[in-house]
Amino acid sequence: MSELRINKTLNTPEIVFDPDQGILSIEGRSIPENPNDFYTPLFKWMDTYFDESPQEKTRINIKLEYINSGSSKFLLQFLRYIKQKYDEGNECIVNWYYEEDDEAVQELGEHYRSSVKLPFNMIDYID
């Protein structure tokens, strides 16, 4: 399985998934006009990964500077999907990065953490 790379734009985050390392990174702004069209390939890619060659541990690193409501709904769906894979025996961990003074992104991460109930680290940083 090859690497998935979706380049960042003004409205969409960079998505990099390295199946050999089991690391998915989502970074940037997430305000696409149609979140379903943007994120559906990621679901398909992750399905193939978990069906064919999951690593011992899968890490999901999320570092968003801004996210709109449509993307937020998708992301919750995606994290529920990861929770399902976790419940099926795949070791998964989410690392949610937020700027030290960005309460909105921090609170969103805390909401996701309490909603999906899987290993979920809240990591603050200074930009």
Spans of model-derived segments:
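N-terminal amphipathic/basic leader segments beginning at the initiator methionine
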Residues: 1-17
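A general structural motif
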Residues: 21, 55-59, 89-93
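A cross-taxonomic marker for long C-terminal extensions/tails that follow the last structured domain
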Residues: 110-127
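Short, aliphatic-rich beta-strand segments
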Residues: 22-28
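Amphipathic alpha-helical interaction surfaces in cytosolic regulatory modules
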Residues: 37, 42, 62-112
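A generic structural motif
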Residues: 30-32, 66
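A short, well-ordered alpha-helical element
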Residues: 12-15, 33-56
